[in-house]
Structure formats: structure tokens, C-alpha cells
Amino acid sequence: RYGTDAATHAPEWISRSAGSASDVRFEALLRRLDDRTPDPKIRLTRRRVVVDGRMMEEFTLVSHLEEEVGLVLEVAVTPDATPMQEVKSGARPAAAVERTLAGDAVELTAGAASMRLRAPGGEVTASGDDLVLTWHVTCPPRAAATVSWHVDLDDPSLVVRGTARQVDWALQARGGDPRLNRWLRQALDDLDALRLTLPGSPDEFFAAGAPWFFTLFGRDSLWAARLFLSVDPGMAASTLRVLGRLQ
């Protein structure tokens, strides 16, 4: 939410675009701050990036007004440490999350799992079950201003991990329909985001059982690796090594 005084307003979200399976942008208008002309001159871009163990959001205010713009930007975050089996069953969230606030950061713990949230340049406060991240933003005339927050997660009980290996899978579809190449790029990007490893081993496999399990299923992971042989035979080899060590 945003505002220039005690009252805050919700942005008017108008579009979404995905740069990858792990990177998405949302565009919004802030009409309460704009001038009276029909064409919007102030936009807010919200970019969300997810990598192994971290989620980051970046808010960029872009102004084409002739005067300086000042506003308060608020983001409400609701910590939730409910185990997946309870989410799957539809049970009410019951996992207690302990919070330790410290200026622009907060430490969150739930059993052995922990999270550290930071909002550089802002302030983190508690409001009921929510955390409210607040920034006082000043955007110069015809310029941009950016604030961000991120959360780092650590859970030693997880039986799978992400992978740090970068891949450059590329395929060119045959045919004249441009939608086919777009679909192919999306499919490869989704598969990239599905790569997992087991703790202490670099060998990768494709996650299966989404969304409730999202882990190693020998049959499903082998099928996926087999269908992917023409793109990256290394995925089949590493999947076999993973399964071999578990025999």
C-alpha cells in the first residue's frame, strides 16, 4: 500500500510478466499521486526473485512528473511455518512463529526452521500476525527510486536442496507457429526450476509430486530424465546416481 499521509491506498495492478520461472514482475499505477492528465505518469514495478534459500522483492517507483514525489510505501508480510502435510489436509495453521524485531530486520523461528527478513532503508514492525515493512520514499522529478526487502530461509529438516549449477538449455522448434517456440522456452525454464539435489551430493534430478510433495520419486524422476535425454543426457546420469546411492 502507499500514501502521502495517514491514509494508504492499494496500487492499481495492471500487468504481470515473467522473466523466468524464478523471476516475475508486476506493474501498477499510483493514481492518488498522479496529476490530472489522462495519461498515467507514475508507475510502480514490483519484481520478485526466488533462488535457493532466498526470496527477494524490489519496488521501483518511476515518475514522469515535473515535481518531486514523496510517499510512504507499506508491505504486509504474514509469516507462516505450517508443515506441508497440514497444508495438504486443509488444517488451520498452527505452527507458532517466534519473532525478534530489530530496526529494519526481524528474526523468525519455528522449531528448527529459521528465517531472517530485512528491509534495508525501511522499518519492520509487528501488526497482529503480520509484519509491516515501511519505507519513506522520495522520488526526484522524472526519475526513479527503488526499495527492496528479502528473506533468507534455513530448515535443516528439509530432505532436498536446490542446485547452484547454471544451465543453458536451448532448443529451436520447427514450424511456423511462433507460439511453439514460446511454449518450448517456458517448458525448459520450468524444468530448470524443478532441478533438485539431496543434501551432501551435487547430483541433480527433476522434482516430482508437485505441489504437495515436490521431491524425489524414482519412477517419475526417471521418466522425466528419459524424455529429456535429447536435451541433457547428464540429467539421466545424475538421476541414476542419486537412485543408486539410495538402494
Regions from the language model: what does each represent?
Residues 43, 51-56, 63-216, 237, ...:
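Acidic/polar, glycine-enriched structural segments that form the non-catalytic walls/loops
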Residues 1-27:
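Acidic-aromatic substrate-binding/catalytic surfaces of carbohydrate-active enzymes
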Residues 20-53:
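Low-complexity, acidic Ser/Thr/Pro/Gly-rich terminal tails and inter-domain linkers that flank the onset
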Residues 3, 29-31, 62, 109:
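A generic structural motif
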Residues 1-4, 191, 226:
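Short, Φ-rich (hydrophobic/aromatic) sequence segments
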Residues 1, 9-11, 35-38, 156-159, ...:
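Extracellular/luminal low-complexity Ser/Thr/Pro-rich, glycosylation-prone repeat/linker regions
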